[in-house]
Amino acid sequence: MIERSLAGRAAMVTGGASGQGRAIALALAEHGADVAIGSFLATHGPAAAEEDTYLPPRADLDAVCHEIMARGAGAVGCDLDVRRTDSVEAFHAAAINAFGKVDILINVAGVCAEQAVCGHSESLWLDIIDTNLNGYFRTTRACLPAMIERGWGRIVNIASTAAAVGAKDNPAYCASKSGILGLTRCVALEGAPHGVTCNAISPGFVNTKMLRASVKRWLAAEGNKRSEEEYIASIAAGYPRKSIIEPEEIGAVAAFLCRDESSGINAQDLTVSTGALW
């Protein structure tokens, strides 16, 4: 039986309707936290052609809320655009209205796109930075003051091994993830005297619909000479355990960082890559 170590806590999870966000939301609920999830939904229309992302339908958001409630926790689901301050504030208000507070903030929402620096679209650059980095700032700005006032809080930011390693033709994504590490450390130092921690998790490749969107594009670039599973297996071959990361593994790490007993872990970047060091 899972210990309800987060009972009485309330969480906000961006990107919570799918992938890592969903896995983290369910892990928090398993440990007793009420969870508000926000995602940019497919009702806004298709994602930009050059971006690798997954826009969930409203049904996915509702389904995750039902999964949270099935674990004995409260749930709220919202359409969320982290590029807009008013959308972030509405999501925060919905969580406060439902649970009375936000103790835990998990920032997951993000997009990816590949373009070389030479000729890189400025609008694409700005959109990736605005989503992946500025979005984390906006949610943190909304949640941090009350955490400090109450003397307890946990913020977990999903970064990426791309922040440290870099990736060819992926400057905006890598820059945004590096920026997340800097933001994480600054927030950690601001919150530390008040019982608030802020840490980052940097996964390698995670088995999500967003990854598979990238794989489809990579396969097309090489002429679709192999299947998605064959391509993912080729990625996994470079990992020490010969498999990529599952979303639930990220959920477990995030839930651990939110425990009372994790208060000494602050301003850290935890790599989850099965030991791959590149």
Residue ranges and their predicted role:
Residues 3-42:
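Canonical Rossmann dinucleotide-binding motif of NAD(H)/NADP(H)-dependent dehydrogenases/reductases
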Residues 116-117, 121-129, 235:
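Substrate-binding pocket helix/loop in short-chain dehydrogenase/reductase
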Residues 137, 152, 243-272, 277:
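C-terminal substrate-recognition "lid" of short-chain dehydrogenase/reductases
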Residues 140, 176, 184:
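Active-site helix of classical SDR
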Residues 145, 189-190, 263:
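Alpha-helical segment proximal to the catalytic Tyr-Lys
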Residues 192, 197, 265-267:
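Short, small/polar-rich loop/turn modules that mediate ligand/substrate recognition or access, typified
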